Amino acid sequence: MSQPADINQSESSAETITQGRRADRPEETPSSSVYEQNLRFGDFLMPTVGDADATDSLSQSTNDRDIYSPREIDQYTRKVSSRTDPSTSTISNARQHPRNSVSRLSRSSSNVRQQRDIPKQNFKVRPLSPLRGQSPASLRSEESFTLKERQNAINKTRAFGMRLWKPALYKKFRSINRDADIDIHDEPLKRPNTSISNVIWLICFGAPLFLVIFICYIFFTVLSFFNVPDAIVYSKLCRGLMFYLLYPFGQHVRHKVKRLSVRSPAHPIYQTQHSHYDETPTSHHPDPARLNFLSFSFCVNPMNQSLDCNTTPHRRNASSIIYTLMYYLIIAPTLLITSAICMFTIFFVPCARTLWAICRHLRTCPLSLSFRPNLALPLSMDSSDVVLLCVKKAASWKYYKYTIDGIYIIYFDMLALIIPTIFFGFFGSQGHWFTSSVFLFTASLVSIIPLAYFIGMAVASISAQSSMGMGAFINAFFGSVIEVFLYSVALRKGNAGLVEGSVIGSILAGLLLMPGLSMCAGAIRKKFQFFNIKSAGATSTMLLFAVLGAFAPTMLFRIYGPFRLDCEPCGANCQKCTKHYVLENDSLYKNRVLPFTYCCSIMLVLAYAIGLWFTLRTHASHIWQNFTADDISFLKAEEEVGEPVNQDTAGNMSDSSEGGEAVVNGNSQHHHNRDDASSGLSSNGSENESLEHEPTNELPQRPLVNQSQNSHGDDAPNWSRSKSAIILLSATFLYSLIAEILVEHVDTVLDKFAISEKFLGLTLFALVPNTTEFMNAISFALNENIALSMEIGSAYALQVCLLQIPCLMGYSLFQYYRSGDSISFKHLFTMVFPTWDMICVMICVFLLTYVHSEGKSNYFKGSILVLAYLVSMLGFTFFNY
């Protein structure tokens, strides 16, 4: 099996359009070139240099070449060819240039969006043969699963104490990333779209960039009058650059390529090009490096190979030195700042990537670049230029789904707010708007969202790559440590009401708001969804015990505790009295209730430990070791089809739609759009011995992950364990600093807006840190997996009751005895809640239990849960004593 070609990532490399392939040995050279393979399968992929996901995707496309039979390839080729409309494609515009081989590109260029219709077979896992020192049972353990399968297994089984996570933890080439590559490597023959985003670019970004580069152009023009060597060359470069940056749509960037010899069949460009010009390559062949862009720019770009920037001589003279200074002082900072601004706007991703690519090439090989309008095409056969970049639109709404290293771009953009907030919060001087309490409070609250997401991603990544015991421990510790630290800081500042409201608000959000919104969101795609009633029953049992343990001290104190009557006259012979429970200087609370709260806290932690023990010792073998081939096929079918697959032993549970490959389940075959070019099949040499492609729909044996770890695909994580650990610790440290700033300015905000600290805890402090959980729950529901959505809310409510409340009691106990029994109750978490809080939580648990008992969700039930949450919040608003 051929291996991916080494991509030259040196300074002389350019922005690539597609990934080439190279055979390891002459005898392993494929019979047909990768150009033809990509052409036939419609894999119109345009990765950037160093983009691992893109390299993985193209590597998989070549693996698919070996899976499909010649008959299937021929059928798909005819199918795609029949869809090409000569009246709308660019082929009719270039038929007058037959040497350009445009007709061969019809299936790659005009059918880019149709590449998802590729038929794909489903395979079954064959029994693993035991290796030396290993039993068949050990081979079926968790080490034999890819990371994708392990994540799906964790989500499907919903093991107690494990982190449920919707975004892919493995390397996955997403359709939005492929579209982003296409948008900056579009067909120069197509006319640009006249859109409002292009006008916004012209006014907001193009004009300022034009003025900055115009200064450099004037300077080099003046130098050219004094006959400074190469000044006129740099002047032309700046002139083309400033007009391109003013309005890049309808123009393209060219790059000169050094002429290469094609006499050697071992040359990478020769290997990927020769079969498309002549059946028998000869020395009369034209130089592939000099062919115009229409022959290879959209499939095999020579920039992907070792692009030589010495085509244009680069002499060290006064002009080059001046240009270098201008580049680092003026051009590069301007382009990079503008690129960052475009990236922060989320929707201007094509412009941001274009500016980044131009900035790189202006540093390495500026004189090899040229900027031309699209009317200058096609290129002549003797031209050594190739098309590097071609952008048709400045922005698109779809880029809110764009990912960087597996993280959505919106979370990366929000990271830019963290460091300034910490700096202004600790070192900023008063008197400025950016050091005001309102600004720092708002900025700190927003900064919590990306930090919580990164912590959740790191915890899920470590859990999926480690044993279940380690994953459960990491989730239990870091899943609650950030909230516990925030609450501890608030208690130290004397905001016990804020902590009390945050705890109640988190429970209500997990029991009502999160499942309610998930049901309403899931009804958008499917009116009814079903889940396993037995699994939901176990969760309901845990919730009932958690509520009993958390609110038992409150019930006993309300029944047996003393109270105080505060009366005021209402007339001549009447008084209006209000009953208040006071904990200070109360002997019943000190001698009876307080020890009882410590016992309840121990019981809550013990219940969590028993649940983990049951999961690790009982469910672990069921989840990992006893997974049969049918279970794995069921997981794949659920994940690839994106719909629940009927199976007697699996209940009504279905997994998320991570991908969209068509599968074969039983005797019925379902074809769906293909979202993702990655697959579980790998091409490592160590796997070839255990892989068998047979027409009996059997999946080749997958090797042990720890023995043959792929560098891409389902086996390769987005974050390694060491990287996840570093991110986890760093995000936790930053979260602690943000929590200090947030609590420091709470009192000022409360005084300015006249709201109670408990209501602030019920709303902002309870909802904002849980934004990641809401995102995961709604994403699962949209992918027709409402069971996981409801499990996320219940699991978080259990974590609050079973872990966070005992931790707060432990912190209060430490503060109570350290202060010598003289500390105020404003600095303690008493575990004695108001009566309305207790009644609300209990009713909500019974309401959710009733919804669980039916095993069916729809927008009606979701709306009822959301309305119940709103009623509870209104009660806290109008009767918050």
Swiss-Prot record:
Its Gene Ontology molecular function terms? calcium:proton antiporter activity
Composition bias type Low complexity, residue spans: 99-113, 678-688
Give UniProt keywords alphabetically: Endoplasmic reticulum, Ion transport, Membrane, Phosphoprotein, Transmembrane, Transmembrane helix, Transport
Taking the first listed entry, what is the main subcellular location of this protein, grouped into a coarse class? endoplasmic reticulum
Q: Could you state one GO biological process linked to this protein?
A: intracellular calcium ion homeostasis
Does the record's keyword annotation contain Nucleotide-binding? no
Q: How does it sit in the membrane?
A: Multi-pass membrane protein
**Classification via Gene3D superfamilies:** NCX, central ion-binding region
Q: Where is the composition biased (Basic and acidic residues)?
A: 63-77
**InterPro entries given in the database record:** CaH_exchang, NaCa_Exmemb, NCX_ion-bd_dom_sf, YccF
Which sequence ranges are marked TM in the entry?
200-220, 329-349, 407-427, 438-458, 471-491, 504-524, 537-557, 594-614, 726-746, 762-782, 794-814, 828-848, 859-879
Which is an annotated Pfam family here?
Answer: Na_Ca_ex
* Role of this protein: Putative cation exchanger.
The name on file for this protein is Putative cation exchanger C521.04c
